[in-house]
Every structure is written in C-alpha cells, then in structure tokens.
From Swiss-Prot:
<feature type="site" description="Interaction with substrate tRNA">
    <location>
        <position position="103"/>
    </location>
</feature>
<keyword id="KW-0547">Nucleotide-binding</keyword>
<dbReference type="GO" id="GO:0006400">
    <property type="term" value="P:tRNA modification"/>
</dbReference>
<comment type="similarity">
    <text>Belongs to the IPP transferase family.</text>
</comment>
<feature type="binding site">
    <location>
        <begin position="8"/>
        <end position="15"/>
    </location>
    <ligand>
        <name>ATP</name>
    </ligand>
</feature>
<feature type="binding site">
    <location>
        <begin position="10"/>
        <end position="15"/>
    </location>
    <ligand>
        <name>substrate</name>
    </ligand>
</feature>
<comment type="subunit">
    <text>Monomer.</text>
</comment>
<keyword id="KW-0808">Transferase</keyword>
<dbReference type="InterPro" id="IPR027417">
    <property type="entry name" value="P-loop_NTPase"/>
</dbReference>
<dbReference type="GO" id="GO:0005524">
    <property type="term" value="F:ATP binding"/>
</dbReference>
<comment type="function">
    <text>Catalyzes the transfer of a dimethylallyl group onto the adenine at position 37 in tRNAs that read codons beginning with uridine, leading to the formation of N6-(dimethylallyl)adenosine (i(6)A).</text>
</comment>
<dbReference type="Pfam" id="PF01715">
    <property type="entry name" value="IPPT"/>
</dbReference>
<keyword id="KW-0460">Magnesium</keyword>
<keyword id="KW-0819">tRNA processing</keyword>
<dbReference type="GO" id="GO:0052381">
    <property type="term" value="F:tRNA dimethylallyltransferase activity"/>
</dbReference>
<keyword id="KW-0067">ATP-binding</keyword>
<feature type="site" description="Interaction with substrate tRNA">
    <location>
        <position position="124"/>
    </location>
</feature>
C-alpha cells in the first residue's frame, strides 16, 4: 500500500488533517501514522512539541513517537532506517502509512532515501572543539560563509548539526546538501501533501499555540525534564521552546519571559521550512483553512495509487 505524506510548516494543522484522513479511510482500509517531527521522538517532550496525547489520536496507531530519552542524540540516519522499516511493515500488512511532520531533513531523508556521507572522527572532533571555543552562534555564521543553504536549513542553536554540516563540507569539498538526492520520484511512490496558511493567519496561529503551550505547563515540563538530563541532551535541549525556557531559568527567571523568544524563534523556523519545502515540485499544496482538504488529500493519494 503506497504511503501518504502530510508535510509543511509548524502550526498548520498537519496532525489534525492526518487524523481526519485516517478516519475517512478507516471504513475501507487500515491506516497508521509515522511521525516525521524530530522533537516528537523524545519521551516527555509533549507540550512544547504539540505532541498529540494518546487519548486524542482517535485510535489510530502512531509510530516514531516517544522512542528516545532526552539524553540521547537524535540522528537523521537512524530515523531514516527505523521509519522506513515502519512504513514497509505497515504497507506489508495492507494498511496505509501516513507520514506526518515538518522536520525538513527527516522528511527528505525518508522520502528520497538520502545516502549520508561518511564521517571522520578527527575532523568531527576539531569542529566540536571549535564549537566550544567560539560558541554556536559564531559557528553557525562560519557555516553560512561556506554553505549558505545549509545554514538556512539548520537552527542557529543546533550545534550538533552545524558541526556535522561543516564536517561534510570539509570532507567532500561540496555543500552539505550535495549529499542529498536529486528530487525525482518519491520513495514508495508516496503522495506528498503540503499544508500551509497565509502568513499573517499562520502568525496568529503560532502566537495562540505559543500562549497555549505556556498556559498548559511548558515551564513545568522543562523543569521535570531537567531531572531526567535535559540539559545534557545534545539535541533535545535545543528544541524550540525548551531552549528558551532553559535560558530564562538559567538567567534567574521563572520561565515566563521565554514566551516571546519562543514565538519569534518559531516564526523564523517556519520561514526556513517554507523555503525548504517549496523547492519540492512534487508537493501538492493545500490552504490550511480550506474546508475540503480531506477530499483533496484523498484525491491526490488515489491519483498516485
């Protein structure tokens, strides 16, 4: 059974659309969802990632949620392998896999079977030492000078991925994205739906989403995760919302001042997501406010199938 992917910027309603599609198909065939949001891989990172609670998943099985502790480092290559196995297993039992998420490299690695360049421990160690010496913001700026596209797609707080991109550039002499596949037929002939809103409307949605996260207890969630090693987590500690709350707590605040930088950071991330996904000509884009998105999604999927 061929998969369906629902991708796009943060806060556009991808999870809700996926569940609506799953319910519509449920009378005909089984449906299971495969997460493609890097931060939803983490156990306990629920409020700040807008992870759907189990009770709100409408009985639809979900995969690649809550598979890492916050002390573990998320890896695109590992995700690619494990999520691909999930998709092929779901399809083999005659159900439809729906891939849902907006983590750019995770989506592309999965749908295009991205082959990752080899690593060199000595080169990696040298860039990691450089990160310690100059800090993540400066190193992100250095990446921007040698590979602007990679810098645009990587959060300026994500030291691990900045180091990896610089390592690949040094080892291959090519931009980090040169290791990415040429966009052609998507893996498994996946139908790809993109969900987005007009910018001012999405900004309002992001503001409301940010307010809701703080009202629902994001600061308390971060405090609880600190007891489980969040601060030592290479990737988890840099997640949007979590990094900002940590910074405010470290500055002696109570976490509430993290609301505005979280909103600003999320809006900036949305711009990067749009730039990345809009380059993919295979995506069928839908307006998030349209009332017939389920029907349009199913038409696109059936046209592929």
């Amino acid at each position: 059974m061929r998969p369906l992917a629902i991708i796009g910027p943060t806060g556009t309603g991808k999870s809700a659309l996926a569940l609506d599609v799953a319910e519509r198909l449920g009378g005909e065939i089984g449906v299971e969802i495969v997460n493609a949001d890097a931060m939803q891989l983490y156990r306990g990172m629920d409020i700040g990632t807008a992870k759907l609670p189990a009770a709100q998943r409408r009985g639809v099985p979900h995969h690649q949620l809550d598979v890492l502790d916050v002390t573990e480092t998320a890896s695109v290559a590992r995700y690619q392998s494990e999520a691909a196995r999930d998709i092929e297993t779901i399809a083999a039992r005659g159900a439809v896999p729906i891939i849902v998420g907006g983590s750019m490299m995770y989506v592309q690695a999965l749908l295009d079977d991205w082959a990752f360049p080899a690593t060199d421990p000595a080169v990696r160690a040298r860039w990691e030492q450089r990160l310690v010496e100059v800090g993540v913001a400066t190193l992100h700026g250095e990446l921007g000078k040698v590979d602007p596209d990679a810098a645009a797609s990587i959060l300026p707080t994500d030291g691990r991925r900045i180091v990896r991109a610089l390592e690949v550039v040094e080892l291959t002499g090519q931009p980090f994205a040169a290791s990415a596949p040429t966009i052609g037929a998507p893996r498994w002939d996946t139908a790809i739906i993109g969900l987005d809103w007009e910018t001012s409307v999405l900004d309002e949605r992001l503001a409301a989403r940010t307010d809701s996260m703080f009202a629902e207890g994001l600061v308390a969630e971060v405090a609880g995760l600190l007891r489980h090693g969040l601060r030592e987590g290479v990737t988890a500690s840099r997640a949007l919302g979590y990094a900002q709350v940590l910074a405010d707590l470290d500055a002696g605040g109570d976490g509430s001042a993290a609301r505005e930088p979280t909103f600003v950071g999320t809006r900036r991330y949305v711009r990067r997501q749009r730039s990345w996904f809009r380059r993919d000509h295979r995506v069928c884009w839908l307006d998030g406010g349209s009332p017939d998105n389920v029907d349009r999604t199913l038409r696109a999927w059936r046209a592929v199938s």
